[in-house]
Amino acid sequence: MSSPNTETLTQMIEEISQKLNMLNVGVIKAEDFSDEKIEDLTYLHRMVMKKESFSPSEMQAIAQELASLRK
C-alpha cells in the first residue's frame, strides 16, 4: 500500500505534467522522489499551478528542477 506522501507526490507530479503538457509523463514517477523532497516539490507545484502559460525556457527550467529533485 502506498503512503500518503507517495499519493501526494503522484498527484502533484501528474498535475505538473498535465499543466506543462509534458509528452513523456511516464518518465517522471513518484517513486523517483524521496519524501524528503516533498516540500520542494510542493513549492514547484504551487508555482506551476498559479501560471496560465509557460515559455519554452520556463518549461525547460521546470523540467530541470524536477530532475534535480529526483533521488
Swiss-Prot record:
UniProt source species: Bacillus subtilis (strain 168)
Lineage top rank: taxon: Bacteria
Phosphoserine: residues carrying this PTM: S57
Name used for this protein in its record: UPF0435 protein YfkK
HAMAP family in UniProt: UPF0435
InterPro entries: UPF0435
Keyword annotations: Phosphoprotein
Family under the similarity heading: Belongs to the UPF0435 family.
Pfam family, one: DUF1128
